[in-house]
């Protein structure tokens, strides 16, 4: 990792540099930060002889792999640090790069947790298609009504029985503006319609899609008076939210969400979902608990 040795800069420049540094570290999950420039006091990447990796405790990798070399590691600059370790392991014919994160829990004693132990993601791996990259546009009304292999509209009783749908909507509202509801609390929004899109086409019964590891959830609701991300004001205004849920093989849950207020169009965007008109709103309006 390059450093800023013997370079003078103002406090404002330093603070900006610190923010940029930690943003880059966060984007790589703390592992691959060689190309991130940082002031000397923030330098956390150390290059060691790969042979020293033989001293790393092999059980952290599981019984089917043997440690080959320690490639690099990064650490947080605390008394009790987190170590972000990249190492090479094999079984023994197939070599695989691993990422391991070890968190110290107490200074001056043996008390640590292995928070991450995973193969490094191959950049050439086949992507998850529609469940990768930016969120899609809102589907067209025609797709919602007729493309049953792709979309499943939940009955009110179905989404009420799964508290994660209302929970995800609450998280989206609060994440959009955390300070807006400090005094008043979360508004009592009313869900009108929920449509789910998954990889499991023709799943029978269709409600099994609720348990899919990868899903887009399209929610129509009212009751949100205003938001910095929304133009129209008023509790009566029908809002649309798109939320992606991905649970990977290691059990990590990733949520990505946004409000949708774009213009209705019949064109498709990035080979994902066609954008379209508003969904009907003639359903009953149960409140979020």
Swiss-Prot record:
Q: Which InterPro entries match?
A: MS5
Superkingdom of source: Eukaryota
The residues forming a coiled coil are: none
Q: Compositional bias (Polar residues) spans?
A: 268-279
**Where does the record place the region Disordered?**
266-289
As for family, the record states: Belongs to the UPF0725 (EMB2204) family.
Listed NCBIfam families: A_thl_para_3677
Record-given protein name: UPF0725 protein At1g27860
